[in-house]
Regions:
Chain B
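An N-terminal assembly and electron-transfer interface module characteristic of large anaerobic redox
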Residues: 1-503
Length: 426, 503
């Protein structure tokens, strides 16, 4: 059940699904939804992800039935049929996904029968059942992946050096492109080819043939369980779940070893690790003591919360006080996995771990800890830091006061950027 | 109390899906022979809930309860960002977030109703912040399932200290986002002002301004009013319950935006005897003069305002002359909201530019006045009555090849055309100072188009090459439905496109 939430850090299921489709090259989402859903979802996801708009179709350029009272009463399938026809006529695209909003979901328009009319003619038009009320952004992310698996992915012969990299959600992770790029750079050094679906203008073809992969790497402590299981069941692609964004030498090297272990690339991995760690420490040793010691709190999605907490505690010797995970985690085993990642640290005393999405409750939780001198969070959290006069660094969704292109905090290189940004914020 | 429904489509002779040449449209409108029409294919709109929320989100002693699934606060992030920047521009030491609480309607609530959750959310708002006002926004979902937001608000009247103001801004009620402003004011009237008259305060003017007005613009407009000895009650941006309550004590009202508070000002005149000036947006010399004279006339300051205008002209006209030399004869395509599109069109006249295309969301009696005025200056130009619809915009702009596009640049910049716009919510655009800022901005962009030119070589637009050859208005269909003014949408019966020719 979705709880009443102040200052939510997410959009609806429709917004989450759209974040995925709008990040795929030459794909057009079509909304069967109210007038405004296009803007609300784009503003809610991409707009809060470092202030950009998806390049192909987004916001008010998204085809939409703009359902009004008449459609609520009489149904909107005729309107939808016209809208799909119009979209097919004017857009250059490899696939069209028809996304349901609350209005069509509540009045139960039969979207699939309309999209079937088009797919029967061989046109790539697919239904996605994602009305906003089904849940938050992550629900939409899961629905979108299920839909890609249902409609796009086909079996392909195994390619031993191909991996799929999942778990980093477009836009909902404002640094998704940079994070993908850094992890892909590292995996390519292992001699692998990497599908992300979303970067380097990969598109429908990469998704269709993703069943050829030797391994699915899911960088998230809780997302895409169903999708990973389906890949395994339908195409025999096994998965490696990596719980949290690897940031810095320690976690990234562990990540590299884990991947290499699964694919029999051990020797090569050690060479990559040696080279990359030398690169990182080559820089770190030029700014020793540049940042004074901090007692820090993290307020972020689970991937960022784990990555930042572990890097600052294990690799940078800052003192973790509390980490607040803002994802709406509902499975107890996921909470346990996340808590383990956050508390099994090398030398540092583990931080308090709290799961909370409500802005007011997050502030009260922070109140209960004394002597926090650094708050790593989102734009939402700047207010708290200002009030208390503590340093604040904005590295997690929602971000509306920074422009983000390809910046990353992931991997080896990203950890250096994180330290740079912490210094800038002094 | 208001008799106006808050739905802009219900106003007489109002069109939202139309395209053609300005002379033909003006003639058709004059003869009352424009038929009702609709687009059989359309891109996304802005819903009225977005406008209702953005209008109020900087009220300092308020909490905003949104009765909706979580997606319906997506655009609140824009409003909150503007609010945060606005606080910074006002020099506030601690920059706050707007207090937004969403009931997060889910599947269970859709089936069983969400009134319990709404009640709880209002109590939470009250307990956390003890605000003076709690605004409750409806959504498509809450409206369709029939949740009674008035009933919940009413039942809590004795329990919470705040005034609870329910706003009926369900997105499906209107395709015109400006309806959301009206809906918000209707509720403020009903729940805050309640028809109570107050003693008048001399020289006090209600100055209604939407969120899109920058701090610099507020300062300029307030300066202009102060010169006339007028005190502005600036509403509802950065205002408070106290300022709302002062509304009935004003001697006059005016608005900075043409579609903001216009219906509300009529109501204030009828119910509280407050006359109002509803002219134009104060952008460009002609419009700023016109706007200024309108306000001055309310207070019998016609002579004073002429003196000030003369002095302002003496100050800015020589500088405008310099800008005019850089812009004279340049062909321009303008896209904007109702107020801004026409204001920009008047502005380009100050600089001797030639209007070749205009995209504006509504064609009605007010628009007709502007179009007729512009027809007199520019002859014939293309009019696209659309709220954005980027597919039509890029089609028209590619064919018309203007020297500059004024509007949201996201799409036309990729065609390599210099772009700029007059909706810069964090920077100046208004009054006499704003003219210089805008003029230099337009001229600088035209003279230095490198970014867009290089961008066009690499950037992608999602449309087929064939679309650019097609009739931009081919999806606009007239139909034998109800006359304009009726809200329901009869299915377009594959009728004739309105006017086909685009030069």
């Amino acid at each position: 059940m979705s709880a009443i939430t102040e200052a939510p850090r997410g959009n609806c299921a429709l917004g989450g699904a759209n974040a995925v489709f709008s990040a795929i090259d030459r794909v057009v989402p079509i909304y069967h939804a109210g007038p405004g859903c296009c803007m609300q979802t784009t503003a809610g996801e991409a707009g809060q992800a470092g202030g950009r708009s998806p390049f192909y179709v987004s916001g008010v350029s998204t085809p939409c039935t703009n359902m009004l009272e008449h459609d609520v009463v009489f149904g909107g399938v005729d309107r939808l049929r016209e809208t799909i026809s119009g979209a097919l006529e004017i857009f250059e695209a490899d696939a069209f996904f028809v996304l349901e909003g609350c209005t069509s979901g509540i009045i139960a328009d039969d979207v699939k029968s309309v999209t079937d009319e088009f797919s029967a003619k061989g046109l790539p038009v697919y239904p996605v059942d994602c009305p906003g009320f089904l849940g938050e952004s992550y629900r939409g992310y899961e629905i979108a992946f299920a839909s890609l698996l249902d409609h796009v992915v086909q079996s392909a012969p195994r390619e031993g050096d191909l991996v799929n990299l999942f778990g980093i959600m477009p836009y909902h992770d404002p640094f998704w492109e940079g994070n993908f790029e850094e992890l892909i750079r590292i995996l390519e050094k292992l001699g692998l080819r990497v599908n992300s679906f979303f970067t380097r203008r990969q598109g429908i073809a990469a998704i269709r043939d993703s069943s050829a992969a030797a391994l699915n790497i899911v960088v998230s402590p809780w997302l895409l369980k169903d999708a990973a299981a389906k890949y395994e069941e339908r195409f025999g692609v096994p998965s490696l779940r990596w719980s949290g964004l690897p940031i810095g030498a320690t976690d990234t090297s562990a990540f590299v070893r884990a991947v290499a272990d699964r694919l029999g690339l051990k020797d090569r991995a050690e060479r990559v690790i040696a080279e990359e760690e030398a690169y990182v420490y080559g820089y770190l040793e030029t700014a020793i003591g540049a940042l004074s010691w901090k007692r820090f709190a993290v307020v972020a999605d689970s991937n960022t919360a784990i990555g930042v907490t572990r890097f600052l505690a294990n690799d940078y010797s800052f003192t973790p006080i509390v980490t607040i995970v803002t994802d709406p985690i509902f499975r107890p085993e996921d909470k346990e996995r996340i808590t383990r990642q956050l508390t099994e640290l090398e030398h540092a005393k583990p931080p308090a771990v709290v799961f909370e999405t409500d802005g007011w409750k997050i502030a009260r939780e922070l109140d209960s800890h004394s002597e926090i001198t650094l708050l790593v969070g989102s734009t939402n959290d700047r207010e708290y830091a200002m009030e208390k006069g503590i340093q604040c660094s904005v590295v997690a969704y929602p971000i509306t006061d920074r422009l983000v292109f390809n910046r990353t905090y992931a991997g080896y290189r990203g950890s250096l950027t994180l330290v740079e940004d912490l210094y800038d914020n002094l | 109390m208001s008799e106006y429904s808050g739905i802009r489509e219900r106003r007489p002779f109002s069109y939202h899906d139309l395209g053609g040449q300005s002379q033909g449209l003006a003639e058709g409108f004059r003869k009352r022979c424009l038929k009702a029409s609709d687009r059989s294919f359309s891109q996304g709109l802005q819903c009225q809930e977005i406008n209702s929320m953005s209008a109020l989100m900087s009220m300092e002693d308020s909490v905003f309860v949104v009765h909706a699934p979580q997606g319906c606060v997506g655009c609140a992030s824009f409003a909150n960002d503007l609010y945060r920047v606005g606080q910074a521009h006002r020099g506030l030491p601690i920059i706050r977030n707007a207090r937004i609480i969403v009931t997060n309607l889910d599947e269970k609530d859709i089936i069983h109703g969400g009134e319990g959750k709404l009640r709880e959310a209002i109590l939470i708002a009250n307990e956390r912040y003890a605000p003076k006002l709690i605004f409750v926004f409806a959504s498509c979902a809450s409206g369709i399932i029939g949740d009674d937001i008035d009933g919940v608000a009413h039942s809590l009247a004795g329990e919470v200290g705040a005034i609870v103001v329910p706003i009926h801004c369900e997105g499906f009620k209107s395709k015109v986002c400006a309806s959301g402003f009206d809906t918000a004011f209707i509720s403020i009237s009903k729940h805050v002002l309640k028809g109570e008259r107050l003693p008048k305060q001399k020289n006090l003017v209600n100055l209604f301004a939407p969120t899109s007005v920058s701090r610099k613009d507020q300062v300029e407009i307030e300066r202009m009013l102060a010169v006339l000895g007028l005190e502005a009650n600036y509403l509802p941006f950065y205002s408070s319950l106290e300022k709302l309550k002062r509304i009935p004590s004003a001697e006059g009202s005016t608005a900075i935006c043409k579609v903001f508070a216009d219906e509300f000002m009529k109501e204030l005149e009828r119910d509280y005897g407050i006359p109002f000036a509803h002219t134009v947006m104060p952008i460009g010399v002609r419009n700023t003069d016109k706007w200024y004279r309108g306000v001055a006339a309310l207070f019998g300051k016609e002579a004073e305002v002429e003196e000030v205008i003369a002095a302002e002209h003496e100050r800015v006209l020589p500088q405008i002359e310099g800008i005019r030399k850089r812009l004279e004869g340049k062909r321009v395509f303008i896209c904007g909201g109702t107020g801004r599109s026409f204001a920009a069109a008047a502005l380009v006249d100050d600089f001797g530019m030639r209007l070749v295309g205009l995209e504006t969301p509504t064609y009605d009696e007010d628009a007709q006045l502007d179009i007729e005025y512009l027809n007199g200056i520019h002859g014939d130009f293309v009019v696209d009555v659309a709220n954005m619809q980027p597919f039509e915009q890029v089609n028209l702009v590619k064919k018309l090849k203007p020297d500059v596009f004024i509007g949201v640049p996201t799409w036309t910049a990729r065609l390599g055309i210099p772009t700029t716009h007059v909706l810069d919510m964090k920077r100046p655009t208004m009054g006499y100072d704003g003219i210089l800022y805008l003029g230099n901005k337009i001229a600088d962009q035209i003279e230095n188009p490198g970014f867009n030119e290089k961008l066009a070589a690499h950037a992608r637009l999602p449309y087929k090459a064939s679309w650019y050859e097609d009739d931009a208005f081919k999806f606009i269909k007239t139909f034998a439905g109800p006359a304009p003014g009726a809200v329901s949408r009869a299915a377009p019966a594959g009728g004739e496109p309105v006017i086909r020719e685009v030069r």
